[in-house]
A protein has these predicted regions:
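Alpha/beta-hydrolase active-site loop
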Residues: 39-55
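Short hydrophobic segments within beta-strands
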Residues: 7-11, 64, 88, 148
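Gly/Ala-rich beta-loop-alpha elbow adjacent to hydrolase catalytic centers
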Residues: 64-69, 73
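Aromatic pocket-lining residues of Rossmann-like dinucleotide-binding sites
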Residues: 76-77
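N-terminal low-complexity segments that are often proline-rich with Ser/Thr-Pro
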Residues: 205-231
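The alpha/beta-hydrolase serine catalytic core
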Residues: 81-163, 167-201
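Short, surface-exposed "cap/lid" segments of acyl-processing enzymes
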Residues: 2-27, 32, 36
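Short beta-to-alpha linker loops that shape the active-site pocket of alpha/beta-hydrolase fold enzymes
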Residues: 31-39, 91, 178
């Protein structure tokens, strides 16, 4: 059975972005997942249903997920559905991100608990339900994963991404000067090379289903306290 690659886009993205990855996975069927979920509780049903159907017709399923698409995948998928994952600028700690946005909007936890939802000037709506959900449903991830992270990512700190990497035994590659959104010619070339240098060609795959990497940032950090409840 063939290998299928499923691409999960980020906010305001499109399943059509999967076209870019067909050249990077030439011997695989590449599918863009046109999902509608806006929250992890919605993604739990939608993502598991879609990936279960795809899993039935392939020998190996590889996930490529971007930004919030990575977080929704983390919240809803497991090793029975996905064999390997590539995360691009992933949101890996939604609780921390929500707390950061509350600080940016000068909203206290008590105020959010009272009002339940508070719109912000930067286009996001703070949700008490969302904050409570991610606290009550910590991510559990056992899938071999490689992460591409921009050094200047404004949504996820270096400390947070390193902690997730260490906790989940993932491989982290950092693009110096890179942003959360990989879109410039230089950034896309870096992204393409990151995938190409890790795709199994004539190399011997390791036990995790990846070829031995041509390069690795080796960025590691302690993960102590990653999942304790944060104070917003």
């Amino acid at each position: 059975m063939e290998e299928i690659v499923v691409y999960v886009h980020g906010k305001d993205g499109s399943a059509q972005e999967a076209e870019h990855y067909k050249a990077l996975f030439p011997n695989c069927e590449v599918i863009g997942f046109d999902y509608h979920a806006q929250s992890p509780w919605e993604a739990t049903e939608e993502f598991s249903g879609f990936f279960t159907a795809v899993r039935k017709r392939c020998g190996k399923l590889t996930l490529v997920a971007n930004s919030i698409g990575a977080f929704l995948s983390l919240s809803s998928l497991n090793e029975k559905l996905v064999d390997a994952a590539y995360f691009i600028s992933p949101v890996v700690d939604m609780e921390q991100l929500i707390c950061n946005m509350m600080q940016w909007a000068d909203v206290s936890e008590a105020e959010l608990a009272e009002k339940l939802e508070i719109p912000t000037t930067f286009g996001e709506t703070l949700s008490w339900k969302y904050l409570c959900y991610v606290r009550e449903h910590p991510v559990s991830w056992k899938i071999p994963t490689r992460i591409l992270y921009g050094e200047k990512d404004a949504l996820t700190s270096m400390e947070t991404i390193k902690a997730f990497t260490e906790k989940n035994n993932a491989e982290l590659t950092v693009m110096p000067g890179g942003e959360h959104w990989f879109h410039t010619k230089e950034q896309m070339q870096f992204l393409d090379n990151w995938i190409k240098n890790r795709r199994p060609c004539n190399e011997t795959e390791n036990k995790d289903g990846f070829a031995s990497p041509a390069y690795s940032s080796g960025n590691r950090a302690g993960a102590d306290g990653l999942r304790h409840q944060k104070s917003c």
